[in-house]
């Protein structure tokens, strides 16, 4: 929703991210809906205080243009991170998923449903921590927020959309957990579980086709991780894990043990291997060697 620009805050001497929206570019009811969704994003994003979410600094309007000023996140989005590491280490996938569970647990406690969790909405920072972006399509569960746009289209991305969301039905934390299952499957296999030439075709597969177990594509993936992904991708929400907390607990035995060596940037295992360590982590960076005498 809208465009995001890197900007400079002259007052506080810092880089920020600015999301811009021009409702005048959309006519009639759609413009009103975009305004409402933008205001909701500002309020929703400001409600949740968690290190895995961007901080909102300011919001307002200027010359018919709505703006949201947010924390600038230095890193790579998860889609690019995946493209640069093929195959994606399963330990990295577990570490990303565990961090996402912590964020989702905080978001669901508000209670808010993200409804558009996907790699493009996740940033991996230089220190390996993960940040979730774009609560702009979030549904605040204790309000009468519509589940469909005024055009009748479900809000979200078809490749990551839970069956109940695709049908325009009630959504809940279980909806985000399905998207998390799609995301983990993509990290492990390199592709989302369901593809198609049209959005409708993709949604049909979410509704009626079983996903391919990831160990058929990557035998080195632990059986327990494959089983968790299949649970997350259950068509029936009642067959999925009951919460992000439960999902985290199932990932916990698969997380790397503390003290194992790490030092490279954008390594999502680092927060578990070296919790609270400074970044750059000088203890993990070899000291420069003196140059040889001429």
PLM feature spans:
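Activation segment of protein kinases
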Residues: 26-33, 126-170, 197
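AlphaC helix of the eukaryotic protein kinase fold
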Residues: 22-47
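Activation segment signature within eukaryotic-like protein kinase domains
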Residues: 96-97
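Activation-segment/catalytic-loop signature of the eukaryotic protein kinase fold
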Residues: 59
